Amino acid sequence: MFRFLRVNMATKTCVFEDIPEEYAGLGGRALTSTIVAREVNPICTPLGPHNKLVFAPGLLGATNSPNGNRISVGCKSPLTEGIKESNSGGQPGGHLAKLGIMAIIVEDMATEGEWWQLELSKDSAKLVPSTVAGLNNFDAVAKLVETYGDKCSYVTIGRAGEFKLTAASIAFTDRELRPMRHAGRGGVGAVMG
């Protein structure tokens, strides 16, 4: 059974939701763009609390289909101020699909100076204080692997995202747990930061 995970950074809540009927049959880019179009006010500030960051694997995630494990990231772009989708390869897209998560919708903002990381498993999701704030992507992943092991996949933004640089990307780990797959268009890393 697939579902959405809605993460509110202000209240620190993570809530699993049934997928609304109007999203049936959508995945990846189609899903991220539709959610952003319906839920984000087009005149909001891209780096403000009313923007949302949406992660969605494609419909063929967790299958052996070529390119089936890609992941799409959508938001209002700080570069174009329009709906932006950026996608990446790596392991996280397939892992989300295996967990039955069709989309993660991150909304609102944490208090300035607070950094959080999302821990996901089959039946739970929670925000915990970040242990990797201030680290570059490679150092952050190395530290996360020490904590969570090598059977996970990781998503990081590094310093560029933390500083909300509008060209910042989001890094996704590959099979060797290197953060070398990037969603690099539209400044999505700045929105995550």
Where are these regions (language model features)?
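Conserved oxyanion/phosphate-binding beta-strand-loop segments in alpha/beta enzyme cores
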Residues: T32-N69, K151
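Short helix/loop capping segments that flank catalytic or ligand/cofactor-binding pockets
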Residues: V15, T63-P66, K164-T166
